[in-house]
């Protein structure tokens, strides 16, 4: 999968001279190639002799043989193509010098016509070249990284000196016609002078083979110096202790998301930070590719800043940007910066909570583990900090001894070190044989605070089969005790290709691609890695490679192969310890003094506080008013004031204080809502749950401090304890005359407008705590709800009912036809359902002899959200033995009327009266009772009953434009007609009796009317409030009905009940004749208060922002 970039990477302005670097590089590269071939082959030397001599004499230095000069020109050509400014300067200097020499020869005169032609042509070419180079100056913008120039120069001098001495000795042994006094200058010209001096300056010639040898000695010295310089560039620019310390701090703050984050501390990488210091990218430069390692480290909000800094770095030095192992989130960030993304493969993630050895998919692992255990293997798991130094040395020796390659591989997904004192949080998993000898081991690095990521896997050649499987399984099974919730295993390249190519019906391209991968797996173990991870049934997380454009994909690929260690270049220093000398941390971060030179993690709390002090909170962006209040809190604390002290009960509530006598000493606590300052006198309004009171702070009355102290310390919304005497202000307003006060809770966020409060309904739902603090209506509603719940309990308790609690997590969803919420228990590895009703468990209690029982609790249905529905709601279910559904008509009416009395002070329901007002409507007395069929008949204007056939009902539904499903029976169509034509249009509370049996699977058939169930629904103002049944107690009939429901569930009906065998077994012990009631308490509260369900619930479910 390839993700294309939405915009181009920001680059320099393209000018008409953009071709100059490439042209200059090609020109010099051609001369370098021909010079090399001429130094090797006499035939080539003979073929190009004439043009070579002309170029060498008039245009550019081109000796007959010189390996050293060929090497120099090759470096210069590569640098020119890479737009290196130093290469531009060297070439320009060479051309200017050549032009000067040509001009001098022309001015001197005395030349032949051929020489004049050559010198004039050469001078003209040089002038043109100088003009082009000068005009193309801005195209050579890239720099060269810092390196050990003096060390490289010393190597070059020493190598050149050795080459000169050896060459001098050779020319003394085989002088040819070279004069003795010219031998040392001649070899010096050939070894370190690149044969630039005219051969005519020397007397005689040695053998041409020696000329090649002299140039080779010079080339070897140059190559050695170049290698030293390039290696020093990487080593000098690698991580310093401060860099590593900063990275570790970022990992502790933000390292939970990326399993590869800890590998950013690999010390042969370089790093570049965002200017804020809150994000960084680690990278390595290979063959001109700046290869970033995975995602940026740090705050994702600062990733783009770090990526931009990295891209600018690439542009500065002329590197091609590339990324290895980016996650989906990281690839999106790189894509936003202008790169393309190509899916490389997938990372295998084990979630220990879901891991088990049981099941058919785990058969292979289970058998391998069994074999390993039979061989007597045990597993030991320890943190590196718990391993002694001597034992760690043995561990390192074992890791080196069992490695099947000369050097350690890895870059983006490997740490490259074992047993380092800075890695004490790493985890070591060891397999021990019966003699307690280690036969295999895994080392895993931290992944945030609760994960580990595989770094190293080793096993002895003598370890039994199944050793690795045993270690991985034991780690997953013991993970909870180790505080581990995620385990990152190996990375499988091109995983999707293996899966798609092996699928039935895979196309020829997919099969060919898979065959190629299998073929190359003989050397690179691509398929082996996939198979070794797949058997654990992990979660596969994609990883991506990023690149600038398609033409650099091969270059980025080769750089990745080199960086990962699959291709080891000569003189590679993969096993060397790299310690950089140039810290990359931003000055503002280094200036905090929190970073450590040894690379250990800084004080994270200090790092966070430092960011906050700079106005750059790593956790959140704070509004100005919040920052002002935080600063005030800081000042209070510095003054020794505890803004959040231990509580002391006030002597009075506000309501009690208002009723107290004048001069009575009272203490109240509450929230400050308004403040009026008149200099030495200050008025404030304080509110607690019982009411609001004016408090008066007068300098002459305060026992300690002044009113100005209150004004300076207190903001609107703060919680304050006031102590003083009751009295009145000069205007006669009843007030608390404050003697002393105490801040008991600093409010860090401003309250809404003090006059209007919260007016946005959505804001009131999301911040109910603020709504309750400022809105008296919200407090009235929550009080009314409490009164309704208390009244329901008291009414039922007075009738002899006992309250019970039944399971919310249930193995079978039943008790009602509704779509359930599904969850999962890891311990038993099975799905559970949040109950849609407590009915089946309450009936079990009825079987056990509990004759009057009720439960008032939460139920859950995965259905719509509107003014009368919330997925989580309060449900009352009550059962009375030796009763039927008609008994519950009076009891239900009494429950609701009592609840209205408790909430409103009278048996009334609040109804809209226009203009946003509510008016009470009486609900006392006896309520209407109708049968369902009679009510539907009234609405249709045509009589129907339980015997009306399905065709007639469908005709009536079509006439009334009521939709129905083809698979519905007559009862379901009647129910649909009832819901549309009767329920939605009902005003005063009405009981609708005798529903069709087919839509009441848990209800007893009517005692005298076939096809009718003894059930009623209570409806008021278009809302169903409750339902009651004469419960079905016949276990045989009950089984038949539930089996019908289970068939519907198996057929795909998500609302149909499942077959609860345990419930049916309980029913077979016989349940007495019982009447049952189910009532939606939330809807009763809505009826009584006249408000929607979202207003009456303290915390209704709100859609995420």
From Swiss-Prot:
Binds 3 Mg(2+) ions per subunit. Keywords: Aminoacyl-tRNA synthetase, Antibiotic resistance, ATP-binding, Cell membrane, Ligase, Lipid metabolism, Magnesium, Membrane, Metal-binding, Multifunctional enzyme, Nucleotide-binding, Transferase, Transmembrane, Transmembrane helix, Virulence. GO terms for biological process: lipid metabolic process; lysyl-tRNA aminoacylation; response to antibiotic. Residues 604-1105 are annotated as: Lysine--tRNA ligase. GO terms for cellular component: cytosol; plasma membrane. It catalyses: tRNA(Lys) + L-lysine + ATP = L-lysyl-tRNA(Lys) + AMP + diphosphate; L-lysyl-tRNA(Lys) + a 1,2-diacyl-sn-glycero-3-phospho-(1'-sn-glycerol) = a 1,2-diacyl-sn-glycero-3-phospho-1'-(3'-O-L-lysyl)-sn-glycerol + tRNA(Lys). Catalyzes the production of L-lysyl-tRNA(Lys)transfer and the transfer of a lysyl group from L-lysyl-tRNA(Lys) to membrane-bound phosphatidylglycerol (PG), which produces lysylphosphatidylglycerol (LPG), one of the components of the bacterial membrane with a positive net charge. LPG synthesis contributes to the resistance to cationic antimicrobial peptides (CAMPs) and likely protects M.tuberculosis against the CAMPs produced by competiting microorganisms (bacteriocins). This is Lysylphosphatidylglycerol biosynthesis bifunctional protein LysX. It comes from Mycobacterium ulcerans (strain Agy99). The gene is lysX.
């Amino acid at each position: 999968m390839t993700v294309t970039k939405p915009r181009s990477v920001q680059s320099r302005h393209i000018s008409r001279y953009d071709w100059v670097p490439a042209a200059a590089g090609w020109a010099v590269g051609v001369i370098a190639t021909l010079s090399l071939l001429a130094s090797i082959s006499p035939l080539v030397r003979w073929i190009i002799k004439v043009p070579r001599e002309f170029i060498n004499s008039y245009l550019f230095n081109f000796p007959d043989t010189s390996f050293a000069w060929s090497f120099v020109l090759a470096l210069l050509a590569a640098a020119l193509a890479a737009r290196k400014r130093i290469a531009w300067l060297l070439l320009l200097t060479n051309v200017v010098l050549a032009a000067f020499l040509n001009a001098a020869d022309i001015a001197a005169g005395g030349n032949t016509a051929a020489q004049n032609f050559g010198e004039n042509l050469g001078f003209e070419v040089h002038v043109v070249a100088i003009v082009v180079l000068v005009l193309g100056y801005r195209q050579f913008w890239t720099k060269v990284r810092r390196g050990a120039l003096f060390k490289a120069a010393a190597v070059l001098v020493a190598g050149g000196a050795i080459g000169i001495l050896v060459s001098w000795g050779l020319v003394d042994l085989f002088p040819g016609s070279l004069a003795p006094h010219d031998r040392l200058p001649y070899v010096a010209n050939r070894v370190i002078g690149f044969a630039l001096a005219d051969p005519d300056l020397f007397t005689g010639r040695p053998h041409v083979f020696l000329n090649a040898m002299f140039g080779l000695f010079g080339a070897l010295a140059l190559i050695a110096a170049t290698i030293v310089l390039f290696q020093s560039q990487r080593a000098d620019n690698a991580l310093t202790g401060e860099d590593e310390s900063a990275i570790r701090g970022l990992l502790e703050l933000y390292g939970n998301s990326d399993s590869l984050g800890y590998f950013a501390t690999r010390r042969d990488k370089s790093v570049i930070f965002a200017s804020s210091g809150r994000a960084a990218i680690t990278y390595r430069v290979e063959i001109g590719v700046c290869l970033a390692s995975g995602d940026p480290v740090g705050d994702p909000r600062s990733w783009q800043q770090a990526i931009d800094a990295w891209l600018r770095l690439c542009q500065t030095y002329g590197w091609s940007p590339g990324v290895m192992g980016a996650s989906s989130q990281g690839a999106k960030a790189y894509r936003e910066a202008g790169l393309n993304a190509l899916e490389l493969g997938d990372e295998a993630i084990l979630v220990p909570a879901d891991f088990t050895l049981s099941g058919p998919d785990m058969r292979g692992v289970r058998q391998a583990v069994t074999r390993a255990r039979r061989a007597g293997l045990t597993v030991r798991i320890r943190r590196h900090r718990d391993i002694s130094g001597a034992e760690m040395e043995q561990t390192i020796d074992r890791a080196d001894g069992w490695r099947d390659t000369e050097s350690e591989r890895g870059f983006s997904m490997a740490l490259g070190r074992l047993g380092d004192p800075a890695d004490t949080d790493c985890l070591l998993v060891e397999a021990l044989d019966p003699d307690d000898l280690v036969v295999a081991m895994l080392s895993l690095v931290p992944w945030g605070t609760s994960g580990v990521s595989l770094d190293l896997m080793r096993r002895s050649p003598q370890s039994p089969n199944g050793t690795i499987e045993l270690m991985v399984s034991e780690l997953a099974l013991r993970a909870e005790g180790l505080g581990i919730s995620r385990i990152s295993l190996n990375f499988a390249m091109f995983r999707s290709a293996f899966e798609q190519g092996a699928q039935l019906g895979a196309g020829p391209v997919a099969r060919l691609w898979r065959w190629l991968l299998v073929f190359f797996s003989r050397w690179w173990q691509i398929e082996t890695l996939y198979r070794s991870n797949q058997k654990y049934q992990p979660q596969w997380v994609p990883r991506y490679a990023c690149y600038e454009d398609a033409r650099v994909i091969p270059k980025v690929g080769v750089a990745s192969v080199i960086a990962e260690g699959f291709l080891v270049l000569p003189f590679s220093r993969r096993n060397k310890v790299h310690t950089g000398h140039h810290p990359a941390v931003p000055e503002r971060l280094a200036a905090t003094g929190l970073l450590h030179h040894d690379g250990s993690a800084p004080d994270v709390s200090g790092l966070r506080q430092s960011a906050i002090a700079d106005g750059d909170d790593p956790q959140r962006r704070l509004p100005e008013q919040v920052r002002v209040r935080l600063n005030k809190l800081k000042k209070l604390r510095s003054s020794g004031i505890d803004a959040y002290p231990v509580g002391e009960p006030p002597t009075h509530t506000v309501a009690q204080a208002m009723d107290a006598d004048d001069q009575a000493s009272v203490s109240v606590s509450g929230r400050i809502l308004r403040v009026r300052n008149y200099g030495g006198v200050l008025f404030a309004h304080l509110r607690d749950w019982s009411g609001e009171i004016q408090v008066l702070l007068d300098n002459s009355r305060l026992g300690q401090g002044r009113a100005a102290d209150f004004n300076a310390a207190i903001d609107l919304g703060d919680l304050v304890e006031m102590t003083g005497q009751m009295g009145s202000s000069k205007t006669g307003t009843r007030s608390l005359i404050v003697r002393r006060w105490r801040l008991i809770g600093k409010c860090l966020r401003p309250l809404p407008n003090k006059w209007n409060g919260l007016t946005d309904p959505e804001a009131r739902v999301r911040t109910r705590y603020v709504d309750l603090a400022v809105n008296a209506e919200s407090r009235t509603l929550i009080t009314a709800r409490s009164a309704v719940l208390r009244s329901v309990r008291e009414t039922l308790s007075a009738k002899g009912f006992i309250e019970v609690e039944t399971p919310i997590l249930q193995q079978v969803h039943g008790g009602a036809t509704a779509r359930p919420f599904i969850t999962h228990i890891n311990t038993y590895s099975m799905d559970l359902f949040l109950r849609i009703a407590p009915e089946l468990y309450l009936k079990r209690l009825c079987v056990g002899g509990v004759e009057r029982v009720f439960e008032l609790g939460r139920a859950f249905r995965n259905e719509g959200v509107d003014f009368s529905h919330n997925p989580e709601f309060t449900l009352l279910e009550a059962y009375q033995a030796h009763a039927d559904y008609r008994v519950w008509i009076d009891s239900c009416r009494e429950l609701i009327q009592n609840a209205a009395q408790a909430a409103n002070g009278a048996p009334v329901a609040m109804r809209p009266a226009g203009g946003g007002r509510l008016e009470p409507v009486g609900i006392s007395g006896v309520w209407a009772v109708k049968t369902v069929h009679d009510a539907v008949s009234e609405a249709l204007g045509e009589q129907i009953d339980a015997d009306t056939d399905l065709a007639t009902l469908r005709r009536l539904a079509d006439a009334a434009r009521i939709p129905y499903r083809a698979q519905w029976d007559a009862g379901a169509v009647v129910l649909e007609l009832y819901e549309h034509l009767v329920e939605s249009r009902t005003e005063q509370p009405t009981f609708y009796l005798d529903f069709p049996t087919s839509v009441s699977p848990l209800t007893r058939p009517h005692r005298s009317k076939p096809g009718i169930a003894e059930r009623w629904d209570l409806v008021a103002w278009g809302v169903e409030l409750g339902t009651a049944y004469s419960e079905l107690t016949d276990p045989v009939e009950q089984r038949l009905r539930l089996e019908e429901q289970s068939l519907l569930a198996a057929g795909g009906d998500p609302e149909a009940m499942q077959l609860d065998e345990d419930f049916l077994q309980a029913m077979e012990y016989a349940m007495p004749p019982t009447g049952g009631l189910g009532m939606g308490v939330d809807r009763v509260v809505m009826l009584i208060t006249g408000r929607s369900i979202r207003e009456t619930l303290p915390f209704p479910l709100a859609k995420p922002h």
